[in-house]
């Protein structure tokens, strides 16, 4: 027996799709174009290349440990929340909420993170911290530090936030980091599990119509001189799965020469 599916699964004629495409093109070309383009990250050169974070896109941010991918992702999240007033959900599988808050506050206040962790603050640092706290107080940033969280659990938490009629829906999701996620089911191997996770992250991005920034580790192969003489990462260096670049709409690599100096 063949049952009729949801409207979203029906075949769409090209004529209808062209009308929608032309309508969207008029929007992004008109005087209110900024409302219809991707969400600005606050980093001008990056926004020029990406035209912002596209709704429904899965963006992979990859680097070796210690390269600064968490700090960079938190910087984007903070700018999106504060400058664009777009609610951001941060799922940290590596750090606690307290550690995330420390990083966000120290970055916004311009205080050295080491001094922040040890409490070795100067008198003026407390003033900067007070100003940063005031600026961040109403920033729509939501954090979750559940270890081994699944995509199903993430969606449930996002929908719970979105049910509140007094505030706008979550508009950006940041996940730190991909290799610490689980499917909640038994998998034959880790490569298959990561493949399932990235595929379902892309589906979640489309379902919720939000960009997802998922941080990813790189394999140790990038450290080997024979891989490429400058240690600059490439797609083949993504750890645990070849499907990451297939499911992602964009892959960003962080690299600093000084890291290898």
Residues covered by each model-derived region:
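Core recognition of P-loop NTPase motor domains used across DNA-transaction enzymes
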Residues: 1-55, 111, 125-127, 131-140, ...
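Structured core elements
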Residues: 38, 45, 58-62, 72, ...
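Flexible beta-alpha connector loops of hexameric P-loop NTPases
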Residues: 35, 113-123, 142-148, 182-195, ...
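Conserved nucleotide-binding/hydrolysis micro-motifs of P-loop NTPases
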Residues: 66, 95-98, 106-107, 147-150, ...
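Phosphate-binding/switch region of NTP-binding enzymes
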Residues: 47, 193-261
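Cytosolic-facing regulatory segments adjacent to core modules
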Residues: 48, 82-169, 183
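P-loop NTPase nucleotide-binding module
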Residues: 52-95, 152-164, 171-174, 185, ...
């Amino acid at each position: 027996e063949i049952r009729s599916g949801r409207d979203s699964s029906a075949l769409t004629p090209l004529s209808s799709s062209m009308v929608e495409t032309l309508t969207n093109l008029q929007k992004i070309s008109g005087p209110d174009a900024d409302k219809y383009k991707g969400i600005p990250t606050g980093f001008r050169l990056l926004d020029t290349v990406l035209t912002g974070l596209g709704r429904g896109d899965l963006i992979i941010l990859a680097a070796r440990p210690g390269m600064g991918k968490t700090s960079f992702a938190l910087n984007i999240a903070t700018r999106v929340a504060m400058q664009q007033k777009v609610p951001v959900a941060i799922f940290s599988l590596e750090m606690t909420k307290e550690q995330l808050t420390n990083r966000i506050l120290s970055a916004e206040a311009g205080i050295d993170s080491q001094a922040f962790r040890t409490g070795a603050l100067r008198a003026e640092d407390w003033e900067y911290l007070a100003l940063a706290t005031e600026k961040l107080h109403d920033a729509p940033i939501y954090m979750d530090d559940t270890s081994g969280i699944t995509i199903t659990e993430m969606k449930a938490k996002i929908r719970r936030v979105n049910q509140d009629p007094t505030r706008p829906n979550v508009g950006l999701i940041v996940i730190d980091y991909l290799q610490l996620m689980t499917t909640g089911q038994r998998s034959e191997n880790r490569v298959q599990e990561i493949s399932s996770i990235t595929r379902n992250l892309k589906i979640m991005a489309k379902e919720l119509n939000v960009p997802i920034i998922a941080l990813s580790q790189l394999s140790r192969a990038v450290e080997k001189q024979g891989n490429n003489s400058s240690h600059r990462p490439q797609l083949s260096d993504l750890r645990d799965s070849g499907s990451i670049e297939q499911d992602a709409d964009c892959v960003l690599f962080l690299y600093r020469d000084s890291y290898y100096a």
